[in-house]
Amino acid sequence: TEPNDVLVAPDGSIFVGESHNAQFLDADGPGAIGRISKFSPDGKFIKTFGSFGYGPSQFRGPHSLAMDSKGRLFVADRGNRRIQIFDQEGKHLDTWYQFSRISGIYIDPNDVLYAIDSESDDNYNPGWRKGLRVGSARTGEVWSFVPEHVSTQPSGMGGYGSMGEGVAV
């Protein structure tokens, strides 16, 4: 499949978010894969959870993964414009919509959540702006927003401006 992100948990477990193209699909069918796969620290497959769709534990592009200090798995479900939160066995705990259409997510040791939105516009997410949202992984509160850098110089993909696809710390 098309892995989007890999996260290694504190115990060494490996989580993989799959599939990138599902964010562009509206219905189940060929290529409509949306799941998280879990592997042991030595790479042995343990389980998969999630499927393509719009409901809890369903994904349209699990694009980025992060883990908070409690060991909760945060999945940036970009095609559904939300974060879904799970325990490490795949039990759905919560869904947050206030961080927009996330391309990358990072949670620091103090549970500060950084979510980069590189795609919101009138086509992909009307009413939202590209940029970095910073908030609490404990409560879901968004504290601040840093808008995208707008440039008059063309970028490598032919557009204008600059916006991150992930979060590097």
Locate each region found by the language model:
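Eukaryotic scaffold repeat domains enriched in small/polar residues
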Residues: T1-V169
